[in-house]
Design a protein with these regions (language model features):
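Non-catalytic interaction/Regulatory regions outside core domains
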Residues: 1-29, 33-128
Length: 128
């Protein structure tokens, strides 16, 4: 079991530091949502499943091209951007970060990576 309150506190801190983050979600590598902080009208369970599939596809393409391991995957639109990061915890996790259109991709990526680093110790210290 994960400390959902601690995970949500990391999300709240990230969203306080960058108010243009419209969604932060942590999900298992098989696409089940663990925790989310969102101002979007979206089904978190569906987003978790699709985000993990998209990131897994990016990782597979990277392997097929004989590139290094994929660090993240992105989706860029006029309405905002999405960054998907695999967190290499004891059990791999997916962090989904969505930024509104005024937040450029580089800044979104910075905040998503920082959030992933803050989550890692919480994920490795799971409660039985």
């Amino acid at each position: 079991m994960y400390d959902v309150a601690a995970i949500e506190a990391v999300f709240a801190q990230a969203r306080q530091r960058q108010s243009s983050l419209s969604l932060l979600m942590l999900s298992t590598a098989d696409g089940r949502s663990i925790a989310e902080a969102s101002s979007l009208d979206a089904d978190g369970r569906r987003i978790a499943a699709m985000a993990n599939s998209f990131l897994t596809l990016g990782e597979t393409v990277s392997r097929e091209l004989k590139l290094s391991e994929a660090d993240y995957a992105t989706i860029c639109t006029r309405m905002g951007n999405v960054v998907l990061i695999r967190i290499a915890a004891a059990r791999p996790m997916t962090l989904t970060a969505v930024g509104r259109s005024e937040l450029n991709l580089a800044v979104l990526l910075f905040h998503a990576r920082e959030c992933a680093q803050r989550l890692l110790p919480l994920l490795d210290a799971r409660t039985p």
